[in-house]
Amino acid sequence: MAETMKDITMKNDESQEEEIPDQFLCCVCLELLYKPIVLSCGHLSCFWCVHKSMNGFRESHCPICRDPYVHFPSVCQKLYFLLKKMYPLAHKKREEQVLKEEQERECFSPQIDLVLDLSVCSGDSLNVSDKQKVEECSNAANLLSSSSSRGDIPCIPKNQEPTDAKALNVHENELLKDNKVSKQISKDDLLCSACKELLVRPVVLNCGHVYCEGCVVDMAEESEKIKCQECNVCDPRGFPKVCLILEQLLEENFPEEYNSRSSKVQKTLAHNSKGNIQSYLKEGPSLSNDNNNDDPWLANPGSNVHFGAGCDSCGVYPIIGDRYRCKDCKEEIGYDLCKDCYETPSKVPGRFNQQHTPDHRLELARSPQVLINFNSIGILLGPVISNEGMDTDEGEEGPPGSSNESSSTE
């Protein structure tokens, strides 16, 4: 009984100390955004909430604005660490909750703290200056590196915390002791990945890195493609929209500097000479080549569509065309690439914490004959025909391992 009362007190203390604004609550699970994903429309949801709501047979839709999308973006690490810093208690609770669910499914989201860049660990943005804390982060990163080089798969068994959580527990506890300091947002938390200045009209690329809108326009003008300067991966979606929640955070915490920089960026955009960029800014890219049929592959049984299979690099889901599957990744969920990502390899890790390395072998996978294998064609087409109310995406995907053709972004 004593322990129960203690738990209740802790929950009450948490609610009093950390009142989380609505904008930082996931629109799907209504809890603190955990490992936030920013869609091309600029709206946010948790990693697993986006994954579960995606459709394995057709394009998916944002639960807020119904904007269509076909790519499962990477976690926005800048926003992840910002929320962890602002709401450490709620974030820790969400971490434990999600980890328990992942252990039950034996399928894990990216372990962000393990691959944390030392520049982030030791910077002022996390208020960490103690050498010991930097060494803890370094040891965690070295552990992942050594495991990968030996070919070991650092899977997380049930009833056991991930290595990164153990390594950073001391760091988290010390942050909680000085809650006021840990919640302070510094300018370093919100710098553009290109100009290294305070973000203005922030946009989040498919890879999860954050830029000023004007900096992304400059990228597109130079190469007609938006190529991230941090990971060198091209955004396959066209021009993303401004993340309004991040913009609001910037305006509230740095009003003078933000307004000053914003006026300069707007002048740059107004004098932009590329008409196609202005078109992207207003309308966004088109997801379908056929305006009369959003799902042309459903009408053609011979279409090379890998239903329920997604690319672990660009996140396209489902994969249309050639699909390459790793023969050496041991995780049950597997590791897949679309043709474009196979031909332009990158160092982007698997979206589900797979320990894929460049020396792994990939083979061409055949697309399943879904229309033939289904007992009733209505099972496949039913959700596509019904577009009323909330998207029926989440009910169409089975748990990892439910099919031999299950994918890393199923």
From Swiss-Prot:
Localization (cell): Cytoplasm
InterPro entries, sorted: Znf-RING_euk, Znf_RING, Znf_RING/FYVE/PHD, Znf_RING_CS, Znf_ZZ, Znf_ZZ_sf
Biased composition range(s): Low complexity: 399-410
Example GO BP: defense response to fungus
Reactions performed catalytically: S-ubiquitinyl-[E2 ubiquitin-conjugating enzyme]-L-cysteine + [acceptor protein]-L-lysine = [E2 ubiquitin-conjugating enzyme]-L-cysteine + N(6)-ubiquitinyl-[acceptor protein]-L-lysine
UniProt keyword Metal-binding present: yes
Gene Ontology cellular-component annotations: cytoplasm
Pathway(s): Protein modification; protein ubiquitination
Pfam families associated with the record: zf-C3HC4_3, zf-RING_UBOX, ZZ
EC id: 2.3.2.27
Disulfide bonds: none
Alphabetical UniProt keywords: Cytoplasm, Metal-binding, Repeat, Transferase, Ubl conjugation pathway, Zinc, Zinc-finger
CDD domains: ZZ_PCMF_like
One term of GO molecular function: zinc ion binding
Region ranges (Disordered): 385-410
Keyword Zinc-finger: yes
SMART domains attached to this UniProt entry: RING (SM00184), ZnF_ZZ (SM00291)
Group of enzyme by EC: transferase
Stretches annotated zinc finger (ZZ-type): 306-370
Function: E3 ubiquitin-protein ligase that mediates ubiquitination and subsequent proteasomal degradation of target proteins. Functions in the N-end rule pathway of protein degradation, where it specifically recognizes and ubiquitinates proteins with a N-terminal bulky aromatic amino acid (Phe). Does not act on aliphatic hydrophobic and basic N-terminal residues (Arg or Leu) containing proteins.
Name of the protein: E3 ubiquitin-protein ligase PRT1
Organism of this sequence: Arabidopsis thaliana
Designated gene of the protein: PRT1
